[in-house]
Amino acid sequence: MTTAGAVPERTQVVRVAVSVPQALDRRALTVRVDAVRYTIDDRYQWSLPFGAEVEEALRTRLAARYPAYVFVSDLSAVANRADKRLQFVFDRYEADQKGSAVAHGYCSLRAGNQTVWTRPFAFHTEAEATPEGIALALQSLLDAALSVCVLEPEGR
């Protein structure tokens, strides 16, 4: 866990937040892939609890991509300091039992009261129609959604 004393003053702190549709049926088979637990019912597959687990998966990916930044969801860990706020809003993030998966929504970056950018994303993929195949497809959709999120210019 990151503490306020562990974050140098010159390190950028980015608060990551995820907004999602209300979670659906919780009585189903569960498959865990990456940091996200995917739950399957008769028609669709979701991540439950979606927001917290997807947020953790996104923070892990962002930290690997941008090691000069600290990514948090709870600002108390860094003395309520946030230089930027990265918001992911998912309108859809689901798969059906035939192996079709979709992620749709947008992400935005704010610095202070200013919106730096807002970018939509819409990705669709086909997967092996097994719980593991569908979970891997949903995981790849997270990577695709993250691909539209650029915190700094390339080559920096």
Predicted regions located by residue number:
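Residues that form or immediately flank small-molecule/cofactor binding pockets and catalytic motifs
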Residues: 20, 76, 126
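Soluble periplasmic/extracytoplasmic beta-strand elements of cell-envelope proteins
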Residues: 12-18, 30, 85-89, 102-108, ...
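Surface-exposed short loop/turn segments
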Residues: 1, 65-114
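A structural "domain/chain start" motif
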Residues: 1-52, 154-156
